[in-house]
Structures are given as C-alpha cells and as structure tokens.
Swiss-Prot record:
CDD domains: C1_p190RhoGEF, PH_p190RhoGEF, RhoGEF
Posttranslational mods: Phosphorylated on tyrosine upon stimulation of cells by laminin.
Subcellular location: Cytoplasm; Cell membrane
Gene3D superfamilies (alphabetical): 3.30.60.20, Dbl homology (DH) domain (1.20.900.10), Pleckstrin-homology domain (PH domain)/Phosphotyrosine-binding domain (PTB) (2.30.29.30)
Region (Disordered): 288-335, 483-525, 709-761, 774-799, 1186-1207, 1574-1598, 1612-1700
Domain DH: from-to ranges: 848-1043
Organism of this sequence: Rattus norvegicus
Region (RNA-binding): 1493-1524
Description of how the protein assembles with itself and partners: Homooligomer; forms cytoplasmic aggregates. Forms a complex with MAPK8 and MAPK8IP1. Interacts with RHOA. Interacts with microtubules. Interacts with YWHAE and YWHAH. Interacts with PTK2/FAK1. Interacts with NEFL. Interacts with CTNND2; prevents interaction with RHOA.
Region ranges (Interaction with PTK2/FAK1): 1294-1303
Residue numbers spanned by region Interaction with microtubules: 1421-1700
Annotated protein name in UniProt: Rho guanine nucleotide exchange factor 28
SMART domains given in the database record: C1 (SM00109), PH (SM00233), RhoGEF (SM00325)
Domain (PH): residue spans on this chain: 1085-1187
C-alpha cells in the first residue's frame, strides 16, 4: 500500500489516497476505514473507493507531533474487519499551528499594536498572512480550547468597555475566514460590538482598511452562526468530531492500548449510520455548550435561566397552539423562534417523566376519545453514554387527498435533506409534476430547528447516501407492529401525519393497497442504518366519505432497536387502525409461548398520567394483543402441516453432468477430479455418485417453498413494486405483519390479499419473524429456549434444513469470501493448477518445490478458514444468540482475533508473491523466492507476537476444553453446537477439532520448510533465507513449548497451594516458623515436582511429594485429601537451596543424599526415587536451581504470627487515624467556606455593590501532599499592608478634603507611593516564584496574583477617586479574611500530615531493633561472612579492572601498530597499483604493436600463399612441357628399336629383377603404344587438347594404377606375386598419370636436350611419376614377350618397343 502523502500539519484535513497493487481489487459493496494509531490517540475515518485499487480519505487532526501508523481496514457485513495494508504519516507543527496557539493564549492580553508584535517571533509580514487564513481556521478547529475560554479571553459576562479582541486582530490582518470562524465561537457576537481602547469596533476597522467583504458580512450579520465543526464527547476516552467543510466524521479514542480495533470501528459505524441519533446528540451537545458558555447578544438572561432550569416558555403552551404557531410559518423574529424551539426540545429531553406521561396520555386517548391522529411515533430510548433518557423526533406533517398522498410517495416527492440555503424551520412541501398538493391543507414540519442540526443533516445526507444504498440492497427494513382498532367513535378532524426521524429514505413508490414503510432503529454492532420513510394509511384516504364519517382512527407506535453491546432497549410498535367500529377483525400471528410479553414490561416504560381505570384499559388492550399473538391453536396446525411436508423439502433432483474446472463434492468435501459426478438440477449441488445420500437437503426447494409461504405484505424492501390502478380502492387487513430481521436476504414485497383473515402461511412467517426479533433483542441473560428449538417449532424442518437456512441468511457473505480464496488452492498440487505444457517445461526439482510451496499456501488457507469458523460461526453465535459473557467466550477462544490477523497478513504476503510470479496468464506461476516472506513472518515483532498469542492459546487449551465440556451440559448450548456443526461452513468441525487444529498449526511449518529446502539449490540467497526461517520457526516452537510448560507448572503450583492446609507449618533449624503464607510469594515459582521416598532413621520409606521451587525444596505429605508439611525424624521439611549439595548413595542407583550446609546447622536427607533416570533428573534440576538461587536469605523465612499481627494492627491504626484526620480537615475546610459564603452575603446586604468575594478557599484538601502555607502567609501580609494603606488613605482624604488643591495632596501622593512599593505585583510575583511552586489548587497562584493586581489597581484608583475608600476597605478586609481562612485550613492539613509522619517514624524505629534482635549472632556471622566475601569480590574487581586497563592499553598499542602497518601497506599497495597501471599501459602498447605485426604477418602470409599458387601453376606448366619433350623423344627413337626375343628366358628374368629394383617403372605393351601413336597422329577435329587417356576411359583407372604401384612398393617380400600383378597390370590398358593434351606432337630438339640436362628433386620425381632416365633404362631391359599377344596388330607387331 502506498500513501499519497507522508507529512501533514497537526490539524490534518488533507486528502490522502491509498493505492494498492494492481492485483488487489477493492470490493464495491464493502466499507473501508483509515485507522491512525498514535502513541496516545487513535482516529477512525471512513474512506471512499475511487478506483478498483485506490481509496480516498481525509486525514484527521492530531494533538501530538509524531509519526502515526496508518492502516486500512476492510469491513464487510457479517465478520470482523480485515487489515489490508499499512503505512505511516508524520504530523508536523507548522507556522499556522504555532500562531493559533499564540492567539488562544493571548486573547485577553491584546493591544492595538498586537497585530504587529505577534508576528515578530514568526518573522511574518502582513502581506504573507492571507495565505495562512484557511490554515489558521483549521488549526483553531483542532485545538482543545480551555474551559470557559471566549473570544474576549475569559468567561465572565462582565467585560471591559474598551478592549482589543481577536476580531479586531482578524480585521487588521485582513483574514475573512478567521473573522467568520471567531464570530461563531463563544463571545464572538459580543466582541463584534465591543470597541477597543481607541474606541474602534471591528466594523470601523474594516471600513478604514477598505475590506469591503468584511464590511458587508458584518452589516448583514443577524445573530450567532454555527461553527464549521461539531465535537461530541461520548465518554472520557472517546470523542466524535464532524467537520462540515470536508463532511468528515472522525472518532478519536484515547489510550489505544486499552481498546480493540474492532470495537472502535464498530463504535464509529454505530454513530455514522445512526444519523437521527447523532443529529440529536450533537444538537444537545451544542445546546449544552451554549448553556455553559455565554456567547453574547443572542442570549439573554432569561434564556440562560431557562437553559439552567431545563424548561422553556413553550412548555407551558398547549400542543395545539404549538403546532399552530409552527404552521404559521417563519415569523419576523426567526432566530428567537428557533431558540424557543430549541429550548422546547431540550426541555422535553431533560424532563425525566415527560415521555412516559406523554405516552400514557396518548394511549389513554384510545378509550376516552380525543383528537384524530393517523400516525404518531413515540420512541422510548435509553442512551447510556450521553444520558439522554428518550428522544422524541417529530417530522413532516401533511394533510393530503388520495391523489396527493400517492404523489408524496413518488421517487422525487418528499426530501428531508434541506439545501444549504433553506431554513431548518421552513416549510417542507411535497410536490410532484403531475399531481398538486392542496396548499391550504399543507402544514410545516417539526424538525430540529438549529442550524447546527440542519447542517449536519445535510452533510450526512450528501456524504453517506451512496453507501447507504448498498446497505439498503442487502438489508430489509424491519417493522414490529400490531393492528387494533379503536373502541369508540369520535369526531373527525383533519389528519396529521408525522414522519419519524430527520432524514427520509430516497426509496418510495409503494402500491396503493396497504401502503406502509418501516422504521428501522437497530443499533446492533454491525452496520445499521436508521431509516425513516413516509407513513401512510390508504384505508383512511380511499374516499372523502371516510374523512367525514366520524370514524376515529389512531395509530400508536413504540419503536426500539435491538440490543447492542449489553444495553437493553425495548422495542414494540403498535398500530391500531380500522375503517369502522362495526368492521372489526383481529387476526394476529403468534410466537412460541415462551416469548410472551408480560404486562409488567410495559409498566416500566409507559407511565400514564391519566386515571387508574384508563391505565387498566390500556394494559388490557396490550394484554389482549399479546394473548392473541400466543394462541396455541395455530401452533398445532402449523406443526402438523410442516411434518407432512418435511420429506419433500429434502429431496434433490440429481442429473449426470460433466464439469470443467476443479469442483468440490458437497457430501465428502473432496475434489471432483474427472470421476462420474452428479449435479442437482435445482440447487446446482455437485457430488459423487456414492455420496448422494450424504448430501445435505436441497436448499432451492426449501427456498421456493419458503418464498411461496411468505406473507403477502410489504416489509419495507428496497425492490421496485407495481403500483395498482388508481381507481381500485382496497381495504387493508387489520393485521399488520412483523418484519424479518435486518440481516435476512429475502424480503417480502407483495401486497396484502383482500381477505381480512390471515392464512396459515402468514402465521408461520409471523412466528418465524417474531422468533428472529426476540432472539436478537433479548437481554444478556440466557433465554429459556434455544434458537434452534424456535425454528423447529415455527418451520418443522429438520436440523439439516435449518442449517441451510442459517447459511443462506447469516453466513452466505462469509462463505463467498472464504470460497474465493479456497477455489484458487483447492487443487491437490501445483502441477494440477498450471497448464500441462507449462508444467512439462519445468525441471523435476522445480515442480516438487512448487508443489510444497503450494501446499504451504493451501494449508494456510485452510488454517484461516478454521479461524474464521471459530470466529464467525461459533464465537459470534455464542455472543449474539446465546448471549454468553464475553469473558467466557474469550476463555474458549483466546487471542482469536490476533491469530486471524497474523495469519491473514502472512497469507496475503504469499498470495501477493504468487501474483507477482505469474508468467503469461494467472494460472501459470513459479515462485522462485519464498524465504524472505518466511523470515519476515517469523522474526522480530512478528515472531514475538506469534510466540505470545500461540503461547496464550496453547496454554489455555486444556482450560478451554474443560469449559466447553462444562457448557455442553446445558441443553441450549448442545442445540446450538448441533446446529453449528451441521453448517456447511463449519465442514463438520466442532469446537474441539478447531482448537486442536490451531494448536497443531505451528508444528507443520518446519516440515514444509524442510521439504522446500530439500528442493532448493544450495549456496543461493533463497537457501540461506530458508535455513534462517527454519531456525526461527524452531525457536518459536521452543518458546511456545516453554511458555506452555511454565503456564502448566504455574497452574499446578496454584492447585497444590490450594490443597495445602492453611494451619500447617514446620520449624526451621534457626527456630523460625515456616507457614503456608510464606509460599504465596510471587517470586517463587515451581521448577519441578514429583513423588519421592524419604528414608527414615528406622529404614522405612515414606511417600512424599517433593516440590522444587526457585529458592527452597519443599516436602509435603498428603492427609485427608490435603497437603501438610512432612514430619519425618523431626527434620524440617523446607530446605533452603543455598549451600545444598546432592550426592549419590553408594551401591544404590535410585538413592541420593541431600546435604544442607546451612549456618544454622547442617542437615542430611536420604531420598529415593523410582528409577535411576528419575534420580539423575532430580539431581540435575537441583543443581541448576542451586546455581540460579539468589544468595541472600533475608525475606525467605516467615516472621512469627504475633509480630506480624502487631505490625498489621499498628499499620491499620495509623491508617484509621489518617482517615479520621482527613475527614476532620475536610469538615474544617467546609465550615470555613460556609463562613466565607456568609460574609459574602453580608457584604451584599451592606449595600456595597463593588465589593466582590469568592466564597471558596484558595486550597483543597489533598491526601497526597500537604499544602504550602508560606505563600498564603506572604499574600496575607501584603493584603494587611494594603488594608493599612487604604485606611490611612481614607483618613488623609477626610482631612485634606477641604483643601484638595493644597500641598497636602503632594504629601498624600508621596505617602501612598512609599507605602505601595512593598506591595507591588512584581515584587509579589517574584517572592512567590522564589519560594517554588505550590502543591495546592493550581488556580491558587493566579488567584493570589489577581488579588494583588486588583489591590494595586484599586490603590491607583484610590489616588484618583478618594470617595470610594469605604468600599475599598471592605474589599480588602474580605480578601484578607479569605486568605486567613485558607491559611488556617492549610495549617490544619499540615498538622495532620506531621502527626501521621511522626507515627510512621515511630513505627519504623520500633521495627528496627526487633529485626536486629531476631537475627541474633547467626545473622551477624552471616553478614560478616558476606561482607568479607564482598570485599574479596571487590578486590578481585579492582584487580580485574587493572588487568583490563593493561589489556586495553596493550590493545591500543597493538591497534596503533597495526594501523601504522596498514598505512604502510596501503601506501605500498598504492605504489604497486601505480606501477601495475604503468605496466598495464606498457603492455597495452606492446599488444597494439603485436596486433599490428600480426596483421602484417597475415598479409605477408596471404601473399606467400598467392606466390605458392603461382609456383604450382608454373610447376604444372613445366610438367606439361616435360611431357611434350618425352613424346618428341619417343617419336625420334622409333628408328632405333631394341629387339628382344619373345621367348628368351634371360630377358624375362632380367625384366623381373629390374622390375623389382625400379619401383616407379611402367610397362606398356605394344598395342597401347601403337594405339597412342596412332591417336597422336590423328587430327583433333574439335580443337580440344589431346588426352593420354584411351577413349571411353575414366579417371578411376588412373587411381587404380596408382594403388597398384603403392602395393608393389609396400610388399617386396613376395616378388612372384608382385611380378605377376605387375605383368597383369602392364598388359592391361594402363595410361600415364597427369598427361595433358598435346597440340603439337613434335617439338624441337633443343627443348628436349634442355629438359634432359635438368636434374629434378627426388621428391618431385616421386610425386610426378617415373623419370625419363628410368624409363630409358627400363626400355632397354623390357622383354619382347608381348609380341605374341599383339599378333593381331598387323605387321608392326614383331617386336615390342618402349618409348619415353
């Protein structure tokens, strides 16, 4: 939540906006409140919803400059407020606040120059003041004005004739708003006419300054105005303030620690919505202020006397005259008439018996006759806080025809909200565009006449009407009325209709049959709106004949709201109406017999002033009505009828259905996940097929039947109704139904039937409504019948049916609220919530982690649901329905509100994180971080809060369960629990189950956090947060367990103390007696207890209860179901833990020795336990208790009873004497005040009007501090001196009277001036201040100072007017008498205090020796030992201090050395850093150079590669040339062939040997050679280069040849095989490798010779193939064996020739 402002002035009144996150939606039908929590005050202000996530409110004023916590609470109907967010606002003290405080304090000290001097401390100029005009008004509005403060500075009616006032100051500063505000304050009207010391009025100043606006306002001013704010004090801690400028109502509560937030919000809502009551209350508060604060010309002395007496002149007039005078319209003296009306209402409120006598008088007119009144509302109320005994509100009165009456009921007809310029006493005429109202018959209203009330009415109407509409949609009006007709006829008079209340509901438009609206005066804690609507009875208006037939129709209405907050108020509305005396028919609906209204109840509220017979007649009338209501006939009829229809109500109509989304079974509360499911066609309930028998009954059928059986009446619902035709005249039924309760959703909005009898369904509805109203309006005591029994009797339904009705009526809004959050987390896991495609993209650990986080949020929702069930279903029902005491309910549900608030805040934090983690849509989310929320929840303030509330809740678990079982013995409570358990909202969880679930909740957190931690990556921030959160949770659980254990031990200790016999005791070793009373110290606590065995001297064992306390070990023995101190071997059963040693018993694993080494004497006990573990546990706990036991023994042992009784008796005697002396002092002060009063009366009788004496002493008897009499004595001495001066002055005046202008006058003046010097006010003030402040009445110093100042002023006047010396002397005597009497009272009180102090000192002195004597030598020895030990410890402390100082100096030296080393290291590091920087720069330069060289190298490498490619091309060219040369040589050597014999064996062997020696030789047959030659000699027709390949041959053959050559080279170990392969290859079509085409087959011989002279590289020859020389040598050795194979070649095949 973000606030739009962070700093505001103290007076507030700034608009603030609270903006929530985008995912937060603020419901439109909810209420929002801003809570401002300060250190001493809390303010509650309503907020408006301006957007979906934005709230607007007005910041209230605050009295202290501090930072307050601002929280926003959501309040919906039906459950507790929820805190949605919080922030902070700082209140600052600005210049306007300081200037306002200065104006209030300096109001009576102003001078004509104050408008300049007051601005000096603020450094302000007159030109800058207009900007502060409005802020000054707001600051003054917020200030708490002193009691009796006025604009003139004091509350006295006697003011100076010439005086500067705040109005003069406002005019001089030209501040019109401040001027208007001051004019509304007390004394403002008087100050308007008061001239200042310059004889100038505010009007003259305005004229002189040219302030035309102020001049016009002053000239048109006709009386006192109402200020812009109203403040109402509810009690000493709560105050309501209404600001008309902002139309804001603020509730301010002091001592926020003592008030619950929920209670403060309910209190605010109570007054905010009950507007009629608030208008009257604020009006009475304004009148009280006017009665106590004089305001000037508008109030005369007679009016003040009327206000004091509580009566007004109008009370003596007749009612008819009063109505007539009001109907005549506004007179010339409008303000005076308004004041008279104010006093009339005020006197009517203050009169104790007025409402009762008025009610009785009106009711007694039923049998005796009287004026014809159609509707007269009498409201009898009790308001505890404001002491208003009753409120009589009378509204609009009209006399209309049937047509005009229908027009008044139109939507725009009657408006009680006055426009701002409308006088509150003006006529409120009901007008319509289609229908006209008879002007002669129209009458004016009787509304509260003051402008204060009207303004408040207007502002409330404008501000709260929109919110009221939403509540009117939800709540129906309730009307309790009974109809009976009058018994006698009377004369017909014009009807008068009074509309109740101060504000009319905007909803009208009723049908013409029986037109009736309701008055809802409920003041229940939830939102209640006091609505008043027009009341009309068409039966009296249907024809003109009914107006002239002499029929008398009367209506009596007594309305009262339901009980709220323990205050009971009686509500009964009776309306008696009939059309004629002959047409009488009584038909009343009846509640159960236990709800009958007795006649005695009405006697307490209605006290008639008529004769006794009339009283009995009225009582019989009411008794008759009540008896008709409780007739047993209709009850039996309805019971039989409901029994027959019972089965039909419970049946569903299930149909098979398929559902999209996740739904819940209504029978087993499990999720419907794709199983075969059923759905009811009526109520849409979903269930499994196997659970259909367990589903609760169908609510839709019940609702239909309930709606059919509704009474055909109008109950003030807000729905639009059909108006019947105007020509149809309907006579209503004499019976008038009782309305449904305000919380019910359904309203009966149908017209009456024409029949005058009431059917059974109407009786049933009537009985149900009466039951609801009675159950809600009962007192705090338990009713005899439960709500469930009444519903069973009225409707005859089963408990399950009733539970559904209860859900629909009471818990529907709460159920929708719970289900909204539950639907999001009702799936079984996270993987089922998100989209499958989104889930499949996540890792396995992420899915498992999200499942656990989802489970954490899901279980948190369930926990909040459990808490809400406990709060709203059980606790609220116990308080409202069962009317249980709040303390009893809080014992069953301790700390429930705090638990709910804490867990809601925790869940909202997780929910907000879930919304922030959404990706793509709202369904897909991955929460990556949850540890920070867990750490925040379980650390700091939240952790301490959870420890406290869970500690309290778990500690009181057993107590709550025992109290619940005790309450279950009551049948009424059993029925209540049965109904609540059957509620769907409770989910079949009872109170024990809910309490157990809450206590187990904190144990679930560690398991869930450990599982989240298991799937979180280590060494991450989230992992660290989760580890920390896990530790915090475990610490919290341990703290809760410890608190529960301590509470249980404390409870057990209290139980044991209660079982200890009061008279039991034991004697200690030092001779002191130890009794039970010594155990009741708050410092002692139970550490451990258990049953042990004390071994006696004879070897026997005695069962003993051992109690280990904080300072002693106690052994108790049970006797007659009581505990006494154990008596074994005459040893004391109380062992001090000081110097107690526990040792094991040798050869006994279950025994231990307890050795007490006390100074009084050692003692040893042998104690045995049941097991070795138990003994070890005892020894360990005793050792821990000894270590933590305090060392001092004083105060642990008990004193003797005799000494204690004596001391108590002396103290009681001293207190008694002190009370007697205080009473005597009070009587003395009273007698002295009575004497002063008598003297004052004697002074008035003596004829001296100028003499004035206050008949009160200057001190008050204070039992705490005695008054200081020194100041009173000094004042009395100065008063005596002034009296002496006055006497001398009178004598000298008598002597010097003949020669007034002579030298005696100068002598007199000198004498007076010399004698006046010691008694000057300055010297007096300094003397009193030098003595310090007085501990007496705070007004004493001011009064004494005023006396001295007045004396000084009178002495100044004595010099000028010597004729008044006698009055001055008498005045001085009176003042001196008052001072002397005050001094006497002070001395009396001081004497009493002195005597009491003497007795106290004697008591202390008498107790001191006894204490020292009781200690004896043992205590002296102990003291000396402790002193010695103390000295040793002190010496050790000094030694440790010296060592500490040495270590500290050594540490300082070490620190200095380390600091120097660090500085040197730092300087070296800085130098090293500079060197590194230079090296880095050098390296960068080298790197740039290397980069440049690399670039050049790459360029050179590219050029080298290009050269290599050129060399390769050149080398290829050279190969081509070599091939050409070889071809030429081959052609040239054909003439020189080498001839071999084909069959020579030598040649063959030689060829094989040569072929093995030459690896790169080629064998070409003559066929290939001839083919090549022939091919080379042929022309090339295409011009393409010649190819050495045969026609049709592929390049693959060359590859095969090369492979064959490589095989020959690698495997020379098998010459035969290789040779055969070579021959085979040589016979095949082989071709040289890489031969290019030959353009010219013959080259010149020079090229050939040059080629032969070259000697190529062996590597190149290997790569290129066989060299020419090798080929030549091979050619010489080639055998001619191929001649036989080439015989087919022709003639040339005789020899084989190999050519190069």
């Amino acid at each position: 939540m973000e606030l739009s402002c962070s700093e505001v002035p103290l007076y507030g009144q700034r608009t603030v906006y609270a903006k929530f996150g985008k995912n937060v939606y603020l419901p439109e039908d909810a209420e929002f409140y801003f809570i401002y929590d300060g250190s001493h005050q809390r303010h509650v202000v309503i907020a408006d919803r301006v957007e979906d996530n934005v709230l607007q409110s007005i910041i209230p004023g605050h009295w202290l400059q501090e930072t307050v916590m601002v929280s926003v609470c959501l309040c919906s109907e039906g459950y507790s407020p929820v805190t949605m967010g919080s922030g902070s606002v700082t209140y600052v003290d600005n210049m306007a606040c300081r200037l306002a405080r200065l104006l209030v304090t300096q109001a009576d000290r102003l001078t004509p120059c104050s408008h300049q001097t007051l601005l000096t401390p603020f450094a302000l100029t007159a030109e800058a003041l207009p900007a502060l005009d409005e802020e000054l008004v707001l600051a003054l509005t917020q200030l708490e004005l002193p009691l009796g403060w006025t604009v003139l500075g004091n509350s006295s009616l006697e003011v100076c004739l010439h005086r500067e006032s705040l109005l003069h100051l406002a005019v001089r500063w030209a501040l019109p708003k401040l001027f208007h505000f001051l004019l509304c304050l007390p004394g403002g009207v008087k100050a308007l006419e008061l001239p200042n010391e310059e004889a100038t009025t505010p009007l003259d100043l305005a004229l002189h300054g040219g302030h035309s606006m102020l001049v016009e306002d002053i000239s048109n001013f006709q009386g006192r105005r109402s200020p812009g704010f109203s403040r109402l004090r509810l009690n000493e801690d709560a105050t309501l303030q209404f600001d008309r400028s902002s139309e804001t109502l603020t509730l301010t509560v002091n001592h926020t620690a003592e008030h619950l937030l929920e209670a403060d919000i309910k209190l605010f809502r109570k007054y905010f919505w009950d507007r009629a009551f608030l208008v009257k209350a604020l009006d009475q508060e304004a009148k009280t202020e006017r009665a106590t604060m004089p305001s000037g010309a508008a109030e005369t002395e007679e009016e003040v006397r009327n206000l004091e007496s509580g009566r007004s002149p109008s009370e003596e007039e007749e009612d008819g005259q009063l109505v007539k005078s009001q109907a005549d319209g506004p007179s010339e003296q409008e303000d005076q008439d308004r004041l008279v009306l104010d006093h009339s209402f005020d006197g009517l409120k203050k009169s104790k018996h007025a409402p009762a006598s008025l009610a009785a008088g009106q009711l007694s007119d039923v049998p005796n006759g009287g004026d014809e009144v159609y509707a007269n509302c009498m409201v009898i109320d009790q308001v505890g806080d404001l002491d208003i005994n009753y409120i009589n509100i009378e509204g609009l009165s009209t006399h209309t025809s049937p047509e005009s009456m229908r027009s008044t009921l139109g939507p725009q007809a009657c408006k009680h909200i006055l426009p701002p310029d409308t006088s509150p006493c003006g006529h409120l005429l009901c007008e319509d565009s289609d229908r006209t109202l008879d002007a002669a018959a129209s009458q004016s209203c009787m509304s509260p006449p003051s402008s204060h009330t009207s303004n408040l009415n207007l502002s409330f109407g404008l501000h709260g009407f929109v919110k009221e509409q939403s509540h009117l949609k939800k709540r129906s009006s309730s009307l309790d009325a009974l109809v009976a007709d009058s018994e006698e006829e009377g004369r017909s008079e014009p009807p008068i209709c009074y509309a109740v209340g101060s504000q009319s509901s905007p909803r009208t438009g009723l049908p013409g049959g029986d037109e009736l609206d309701s008055f809802d005066a409920n003041t229940e804690p939830d939102c209640n709106i006091s609505r008043t609507e027009s009341l009309s009875l068409s039966s009296t208006l249907h024809s003109k004949e009914s107006l002239l037939s002499g029929i008398r129709s009367r209506s009596y209405s007594c309305s009262s709201p339901k009980i709220s907050s323990g205050k009971s108020r009686l509500v009964r509305d009776f309306t008696v109406c009939s059309s004629s005396e002959e047409q009488r028919s009584y038909s009343f609906q009846e509640p159960p017999g236990e709800k009958r209204i007795q006649e005695e109840e009405w006697d307490d509220y209605i006290i008639p002033a008529k004769a006794e017979s009339e009283k009995h007649k009225v009582s019989r009338t009411f008794s008759f009505l009540m008896n008709r209501m409780t007739s047993p006939r209709n009850k039996s009829k309805m019971k039989n009828k409901d029994t027959k229809d019972k089965e039909k109500l419970n049946r569903h109509q299930f149909v098979p259905g398929t559902f999209s989304g996740v739904l819940q079974c209504s029978g087993c509360d499990k999720t419907l996940l794709g199983k075969e499911s059923l759905q009811c066609a009526n109520c849409k309930a979903n269930t499994h097929k196997g659970c259909k028998d367990t589903v609760p009954p169908c609510t839709k059928k019940f609702q239909d039947k309930y709606n059919k059986n509704k009474p055909q009446t109008i109950l003030g619902s807000s729905s639009v109704r059909d108006v019947p035709p105007p020509g149809l005249s309907l006579h209503p039924s004499p019976s008038m139904p009782i309305g449904l309760p305000a919380g019910r959703k359904e309203t009966a909005g149908q017209a009456h039937p024409l029949s005058r009898s009431v059917p059974g369904t109407t009786l049933e509805s009537f009985r149900r409504a009466v039951t609801s109203l009675e159950s809600e309006g009962d007192s705090n005591s338990w009713r005899s019948r439960s709500h469930s029994d009444e519903l069973f009797q009225s409707m005859g339904s089963s408990p399950s049916t009733e539970s559904f009705m209860m859900e629909d009526v009471v818990d529907s809004s709460l159920w929708s609220e719970l289900s909204s959050d539950a639907q999001e987390f009702e799936a079984e896991s996270w993987s089922l919530v998100v989209d499958p495609s989104f889930c499949s993209r996540q890792e396995k650990d992420v899915i498992k982690r999200q499942d656990v986080i989802f489970e954490l949020m899901q279980t948190e929702v369930h926990h909040i649901q459990t808490l809400l069930i406990m709060s709203e279903v059980f606790r609220k029902g116990m308080k409202e329905e069962l009317q249980l005491d709040h303390s009893t309910v809080d014992r069953i549900f301790p700390c429930l509100d705090e638990l709910l608030e804490t867990h809601k805040h925790f869940f909202f934090s997780m929910k907000e994180r879930r919304q922030e983690s959404c990706t793509g849509n709202d369904r897909n989310f991955v929460i990556n971080q949850i540890g920070d929320i867990l750490v925040q929840q379980f650390s700091e303030e939240n952790a301490s809060k959870m420890k406290r509330i869970y500690g309290d809740f778990c500690s009181h678990h057993k107590e709550a369960m025992s109290l619940f079982k005790e309450l279950q013995q009551n049948k009424k409570f059993q029925n209540f629990i049965k109904i609540r358990n059957s509620n769907l909202l409770a989910r079949r969880r009872g109170i024990p189950e809910c309490i157990l679930l809450v206590t187990q909740r904190i144990t679930k957190y560690p398991v869930l956090v450990e599982r989240i931690l298991q799937y979180t990556k280590e060494r991450t921030e989230e992992h660290r947060d989760l580890c920390r959160a896990l530790g915090l949770i475990k610490d919290m659980i341990a703290a809760v367990d410890l608190k529960v254990s301590e509470y249980e031990k404390n409870q057990k200790w209290l139980e044991i103390l209660n079982k200890i016999e009061n008279k039991t005791y034991t004697k200690l070793k030092n001779g002191h007696v130890f009794r039970k009373q010594a155990l009741m110290s708050q410092e002692r606590a139970l550490l451990h207890d258990g049953l042990v065995y004390w071994k006696t001297a004879t070897g026997r064992f005695k069962d003993i209860l051992a109690l280990l306390l904080t300072d002693v070990l106690l052994f108790l023995q049970e006797k007659d179901q009581k505990y006494i101190f154990a008596a074994v071997d005459q040893k004391p059963s109380v062992i001090s833990l000081q110097k107690l040693i526990a040792r094991e018993v040798a050869n006994e694993e279950r025994g231990m020795f307890l050795i007490s080494a006390s100074s009084a004497g050692p003692e040893m006990y042998e104690i045995h336990t049941s097991s070795k573990e138990e003994r070890n546990n005892w020894m360990r706990r005793i050792q821990q208790a000894v270590e933590s036991c305090p060392e001092e023994e004083g105060g642990r042992t008990s004193e003797s009873d005799e000494e204690r009784r004596k001391a108590d008796a002396r103290v009681a005697k001293i207190q008694q004497c002190q009370e007697i002396l205080s009473n005597q002092d009070q009587q003395i002060c009273t007698y002295l005040e009575e004497k002063l009063h008598i003297y004052a009366e004697l002074g008035e009788l003596s004829g001296f009007e100028d003499v004035h004496l206050e008949p009160h002493l200057l001190i008050k008897p204070d039992p705490g501090e005695p008054p200081q009499a020194a100041s009173l004595l000094a004042a009395a001495l100065r008063e005596a001196e002034s009296l002496q001066v006055a006497v001398k002055a009178s004598k000298l005046a008598d002597v010097s009277q003949p020669s007034e202008e002579g030298p005696g006058g100068a002598v007199l003046a000198d004498t007076l001036s010399a004698q006046d010097a010691p008694a000057s006010p300055t010297a007096f003030t300094e003397g009193t201040e030098g003595r310090g402040c007085w501990d007496v009445d705070p007004r004493l110093q001011g009064v004494v100072t005023d006396l001295a100042v007045s004396d000084a002023g009178e002495k100044v006047e004595y010099r000028s007017f010597s004729g008044s010396s006698q009055s001055e002397i008498i005045q001085a005597i009176q003042n001196l008498t008052r001072l002397l009497y005050s001094l006497q009272a002070a001395l009396t009180i001081q004497d009493s205090h002195i005597e009491i102090h003497k007795l106290v000192l004697q008591q202390q002195e008498s107790l001191a020796p006894s204490h020292s004597f009781r200690g004896g030598p043992l205590q002296d020895q102990e003291k000396s030992r402790y002193l010695e030990k103390h000295r040793e410890e002190l010496a050790n402390i000094h030694k440790l201090q010296y060592q500490f100082q040495q270590e500290q100096r050594r540490w300082h030296r070490t620190c200095d050395q380390q600091q120097r080393e660090q500085e040197a290291q730092e300087s070296w590091l800085q130098a090293r850093e500079r060197e590194c920087q230079s090296q880095e720069e050098l390296l960068l330069r080298h790197r740039s150079e290397l980069d440049h060289q690399l670039q050049e190298y790459q360029q050179n490498l590219e050029r080298l590669r290009e050269g290599q490619r050129m060399v390769e091309r050149e080398r290829q060219r050279m190969r081509d040339q070599q091939g050409l040369l070889g071809h030429c040589k081959h052609s040239r050597q054909r003439s020189l062939p080498a001839v071999f014999s084909p069959g020579s064996k030598e040649v063959t062997e030689l060829n094989r040997a040569e072929s093995l020696c030459h690896e790169k030789s080629f064998f070409l047959n003559d066929a290939f050679t001839h083919m090549s030659l022939n091919t080379s000699n042929k022309p090339n027709p295409s011009g393409a280069p010649w190819d050495a390949h045969p026609p049709g041959g592929s390049h693959l053959d060359l590859a095969r040849t090369s492979d064959s050559q490589i095989e020959v080279k690698m495997d020379v170990s098998q010459p035969s095989d290789v040779n055969s392969e070579l021959w085979t290859t040589g016979l095949g079509p082989q071709r040289p490798a890489r031969q290019e085409s030959i353009k010219d087959s013959c080259k010149n011989v020079a090229d050939l010779n040059s080629f032969q002279t070259e000697s190529p590289d062996p590597q190149d020859s290997n790569q290129r193939g066989p060299q020419p020389q090798t080929l030549i040598t091979e050619a010489k050795l080639t055998p001619p064996m191929a001649a036989g194979h080439g015989g087919d070649a022709g003639d040339g095949a005789e020899e084989n020739i190999v050519y190069l």
